[in-house]
Regions:
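Short amphipathic alpha-helical segments
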Residues: 47, 61-62, 80, 84
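Active-site-proximal, Lys/Arg-enriched surface segment
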Residues: 78-138, 144, 149
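Single, function-defining residue in the core of a domain
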Residues: 2-58, 99, 110, 136-405
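Nucleic-acid substrate recognition interfaces
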Residues: 54, 70, 89
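Short active-site-adjacent helix-start/loop capping segments
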Residues: 73-74, 122-125, 190
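Short, basic interhelical loop/turn and adjoining N-cap
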Residues: 68-82
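Short, charged amphipathic recognition helices of the HTH superfamily
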Residues: 56-66
């Protein structure tokens, strides 16, 4: 299997540093990454779309096309038509591009934490099932997704979810070990069994009214077993629901800042309960990435864009995933160079602007950025890319490992 390292995003020698992520740079990088596996014309079209997203104020077809046209110095209507044709191109198969994208993000990383969740686009009767890499910076990195009609979800949801796990398992390099996080809607026996069959670990929340049966045969609702003092407890070798589905362990906790208790089914039966809770708390990073993608005020505004066809949405989400990752990478350079301090309007030592939004800001500044700041930013960017082989190495969160106790 060909590996797709991150050094493709270094500028070629002789190119001006101010041309970072311009059309020539993005085209060359994507051709190098995907050109052997995909038709070259399609790769170039995808690169044009990514450049359009980087330069657009909104991820609508018209806005992306006009931004691309402005950069490519072509007629605006031509840019819009090119983007529209790309999104409708049945030759751009997500089953082909997603495995390549996953290889680019993960490379040879052996241990990953991923979150799975649905996100809705109600105005278009769409809902998208996503599997994202959980990271250290509060935003999950897109790995795989599939959009379906929300009105057809009834009685098919479980099938879609199991199929997604099956696909991702097939696309991942064999040596990658996965720990899956998911909310209450995913806490069912069929998923437990599939994850165990794939040798994936999991931390899946389930409802408080589900019965938990201990080894000694005592049975109670999960809500009854939650400690009142805010401590997390782990109960091993239990059975859940009235059907007595076996689960290696459950972790139960309700802390002061929690609206509801967390009842977590997990395969990590020897891991510390607090580590399980800490890992599950990272699940919310997928929702923050949804906001980056959908919110018209704080993100790319996909919620305001009407897309009737589910396949068009999935192709657009692929372009967004690339653009989002590049801007996040630039945001990492922002903090490494210390330039993030110039963006803060307070004295808080904590991050007040996401890496994605930092990257988006500095990307817009590149053409006219003052020289001393520009040199600091680009030096940090190049050092980060050279010191790491794969994108996921820079951002990933280490899953909880079973304790030795």
């Amino acid at each position: 299997m060909k590996l797709l390292p991150i050094d493709r995003w270094l500028l070629p020698k002789g190119r001006s540093r101010r041309s970072l992520f311009d059309m020539a740079h993005v085209r060359a990088a994507l051709e190098d990454l995907f050109g052997e596996d995909l038709h070259l014309a399609r790769v170039r079209s995808m690169a044009n779309g990514v450049v359009g997203i980087l330069g657009a104020s909104l991820v609508s077809v018209a806005a992306i096309g006009r931004a691309y046209a402005r950069i490519a110095e072509i007629e605006s209507k031509s840019g819009v038509k090119q983007v529209d044709r790309l999104l409708s191109n049945d030759g751009v198969l997500l089953d082909e591009v997603m495995p390549l994208w996953i290889r680019h993000v993960l490379g040879k990383i052996e241990n990953i934490l991923v979150a799975m969740d649905w996100t809705d686009f109600d105005d278009d009767d769409h809902t998208t099932l996503c599997v994202y890499l959980v990271t250290t910076h509060g935003r999950a990195t897109p790995l795989a997704w599939r959009t379906v009609k929300k009105s057809t979800l009834k009685n098919r949801r479980t099938k879609y979810e199991l199929d997604m796990v099956k696909r991702v398992a097939a696309w991942l390099p064999e040596e990658v070990h996965v720990t899956l996080l998911a909310d209450r809607g995913f806490g069912y026996a069929e998923l437990y069994r599939m994850l165990e069959g794939n040798r994936w670990d999991f931390v899946l929340r389930f409802r408080e009214n589900i019965f938990v049966t201990k080894q000694d045969g005592t049975k109670a609702k999960a809500s009854v077993l939650v400690p009142p003092n805010g401590r997390a407890i782990r109960v091993t070798d239990v059975k859940v629901t009235g059907k007595l589905d076996p689960v290696p362990a459950v972790v139960l906790v309700k802390r002061k800042n929690m609206k509801e208790a967390w009842c977590l089914a997990t395969s990590l039966k020897t891991a510390d309960a607090n580590d399980i809770v800490r890992a599950y708390s990272r699940r919310f990073s997928i929702e923050e990435t949804f906001r980056d993608t959908k919110d018209i005020t704080f993100g790319l505004g996909l919620r305001a864009t009407h897309i009737r066809d589910a396949s068009r949405r999935d192709r657009l989400l692929f372009l967004i995933a690339i653009a989002h990752s590049l801007l996040t990478l630039l945001g990492v350079a922002s903090e490494a160079s210390g330039l993030d301090r110039t963006l803060k309007t307070n004295t808080s030592p904590k991050r007040t602007m996401s890496l994605f939004n930092q990257g988006a800001y500095w990307y817009s500044c590149l053409p006219n950025m003052r020289d001393d700041w520009f040199i600091r930013l680009m030096t940090a960017y190049e050092q980060i890319v050279r010191e790491h082989i794969y994108l996921g190495e820079i951002l990933k969160f280490e899953p909880p490992m079973p304790s030795e106790k």
